[in-house]
């Protein structure tokens, strides 16, 4: 019969201290983020010169929160935008974990419906509307919703009704997929999300929601960038090979 190895209590205590310290640090960082997001709500950063989007401005010139991302892609704008529209966001385990975490926090149920794989088709199946499309350049999508609800409904509106929508109790969200040319065979992919509440009550609810849960929303936007770049550049390389 083997001899049982004595437990190293000092190592165990040290490990627990590190775990506790790590959890405390994570909580402190998150708390600081929530406080910052709360204080900055309603003071969204205005776009830099290269970020200005007159197409998006048609539908939401004023907004209370904004998230912008961009990435250079070695592929023409048309290929980049197509890759963005067709990417399968749901195949990412991290994205799935974020959706499940949100449902758990708000007391909702994960959406187990069978959804289309392409990003544009997915958003439309959820209720989003294409407000404007410029082929090979930009898509502007929009919806109105109550994002703080456990299982929110995304309500699409006709383009001509979106900008003027002011029904109390809602948040209007506009989101773009955009590819700007950057030389003869490259592009800058851009994604921008804007949101504004329609009244004081919705603003109070959305401010709390955004302050606490926007890290997951922002992370989803950023997680799509590298897979998009890889797929667009793969398509561009395949097209160049086919031409030679």
Predicted regions and their residues:
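A short local loop/turn or secondary-structure capping micro-motif enriched for an aromatic residue
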Residues: 90, 148-151, 197-199
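Hydrophobic-ligand binding "helix-grip"
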Residues: 18-19, 34-45, 121-185
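Short amphipathic, positively biased membrane-proximal segments
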Residues: 1-61, 65-66, 91, 182-188, ...
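Beta-strand/loop substructures that line and gate deep hydrophobic ligand-binding cavities in soluble
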Residues: 159-216, 228
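Hydrophobic ligand-binding cavity/cleft-lining segments
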Residues: 34-131
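Conserved aromatic-histidine-acidic binding/catalytic patches
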Residues: 68, 72, 212-216, 220
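Compositionally biased, intrinsically disordered linkers/stalks adjacent to structured regions
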Residues: 215-218, 222-244
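Short, hydrophobic/aromatic-enriched beta-strand segments in well-ordered soluble domains
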Residues: 85, 143-145, 193-195
């Amino acid at each position: 019969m083997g001899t049982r190895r004595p437990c190293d209590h000092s190592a165990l205590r040290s490990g627990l201290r590190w775990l506790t310290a790590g959890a405390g640090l994570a909580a402190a960082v998150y708390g600081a983020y929530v406080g910052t997001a709360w204080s900055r709500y309603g003071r969204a950063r205005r776009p830099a010169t290269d970020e200005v989007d007159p197409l998006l401005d048609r539908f939401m010139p004023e907004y209370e929160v904004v998230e912008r991302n961009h990435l250079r892609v070695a592929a023409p704008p048309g290929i980049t935008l197509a890759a963005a529209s067709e990417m399968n966001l749901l195949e990412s385990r991290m994205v799935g974990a974020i959706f499940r975490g949100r449902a758990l926090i708000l007391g909702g149920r994960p959406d187990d419906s069978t959804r289309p794989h392409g990003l544009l088709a997915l958003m439309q199946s959820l209720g989003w509307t294409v407000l404007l499309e410029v082929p090979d350049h930009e898509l502007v999508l929009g919806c109105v919703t109550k994002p703080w609800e456990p299982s929110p409904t995304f309500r699409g509106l006709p383009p001509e009704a979106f900008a003027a929508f002011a029904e109390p109790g809602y948040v209007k969200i506009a989101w773009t997929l955009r590819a700007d040319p950057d030389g003869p065979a490259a592009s800058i992919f851009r994604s921008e999300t804007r949101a504004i509440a329609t009244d004081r009550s919705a603003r109070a609810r959305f401010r709390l929601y955004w302050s606490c849960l926007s890290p997951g929303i922002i992370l989803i936007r950023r997680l799509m960038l590298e897979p998009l770049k890889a797929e667009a550049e793969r398509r561009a390389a395949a097209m160049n090979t086919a031409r030679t």
